[in-house]
Amino acid sequence: MSDRNIRVEPVVGRAVEEQDVEIVERKGLGHPDSLCDGIAEHVSQALARAYIDRVGKVLHYNTDETQLVAGTAAPAFGGGEVVDPIYLLITGRATKEYEGTKIPAETIALRAAREYINETLPFLEFGTDVVVDVKLGEGSGDLQEVFGEDGKQVPMSNDTSFGVGHAPLTETERIVLEAERALNGDYSDDNPAVGQDIKVMGKREGDDIDVTVAVAMVDRYVDDLDGYEAAVAGVREFVADLATDYTDRNVSVHVNTADDYDEGAIYLTTTGTSAEQGDDGSVGRGNRSNGLITPNRSMSMEATSGKNPVNHIGKIYNLLSTEIARTVVDEVDGIREIRIRLLSQIGQPIDKPHVADANLVTEDGIEIADIEDEVEAIIDAELENVTSITERVIDGELTTF
């Protein structure tokens, strides 16, 4: 019998898939908020690896306060220019010296930011189109938690906070998530006019799904208005076809709905991101740790990206709760929907939450009592192995936005 406080109980109400109205959003990789998330997390991983390499364990740090101030640009068919650069400030705390070993935390952060920007925004020139500044205050060596090679020590929670996860994704959630990933993957490789700043909003009313896509088109690959219209039409057709892989419901796709062709007002950019023209960004203001913004579901407002992966509950419990939810749905029959909530208590071991709460919607004919033991056993096993989240985050196996 586990000594962990695990609760399994039914959800009052209908599963999201069965509700009359559902809203789902995803901010793509090039969106200013997602850029901040991605840079903060890439810096976090780089710092964690550097600490392990130099002193054998992860020291105290956090980089989850990264901010982006938009620049200005003059896009034009065939190619425009950035007039005022984007300004990015990486801020937070980092341990810069430990037991006589100096760690160049700000240099590591700057290098990681450059790598991420070059990989994510190929049309943005580092140092000219975007200026990056790093201000990391000194972290206290006393606050660091051990993450040694054996990975056996269970850290104490750094805060009284909670994480939330759910499974499975609804049809609308899958469409929104996979549409952005596909557009920012093979589709943009084959169609370079499609920039990386892609936002997808899904709305379902009954069996009718509307998908609204905003795509920052890249001016150097668009010769004229006809070329722009063709690029928009291509995105519309691609997303409509993709949606049929995930649903039999009626799907309508709308792309760049603010365009006014008569006035020449279109979503044309020089760099592939709205950050070039007045759209600021911040860590934690976009996707939750499962990659989506889901107002039909419970969500934690914690920023997951950039947080220390050893004992920061805002990161660990959001990722772990999602992992638990997915595992339960995969391994236990008869579950229509599950929500996992994990609550920590500061100073207590992270493998023993103050409460681990599983809320289930079951299939017809399935009672909670029929599957309660199975669900509890999975939650217990996942909590027992909580330190694997730290390892997988540092290795880049888990995404935070």
From Swiss-Prot:
Reactions this protein catalyses: L-methionine + ATP + H2O = S-adenosyl-L-methionine + phosphate + diphosphate
GO terms, molecular function: ATP binding; magnesium ion binding; methionine adenosyltransferase activity
Bias kind Polar residues: ranges: 287-305
Chain spans, region Disordered: 272-305
A single BP term in Gene Ontology: one-carbon metabolic process
Pathway noted in the entry: Amino-acid biosynthesis; S-adenosyl-L-methionine biosynthesis; S-adenosyl-L-methionine from L-methionine: step 1/1
Cofactor: Mg(2+)
Entry-linked InterPro entries: AdoMet_synthase_2_family, AdoMet_synthase_3, S-AdoMet_synthetase_arc
Keywords recorded for this protein, A-Z: ATP-binding, Magnesium, Nucleotide-binding, One-carbon metabolism, Transferase
Record-listed E.C. numbers: 2.5.1.6
Residues that bind ATP: G137, E138, G139, S140, G141, D142
Keyword Coiled coil on entry: no
PANTHER family: S-ADENOSYLMETHIONINE SYNTHASE
The protein's role, per its UniProt record: Catalyzes the formation of S-adenosylmethionine from methionine and ATP.
Classification via HAMAP family: S_AdoMet_synth2 (MF_00136)
Family as reported in the entry's similarity comment: Belongs to the AdoMet synthase 2 family.
Protein name: S-adenosylmethionine synthase
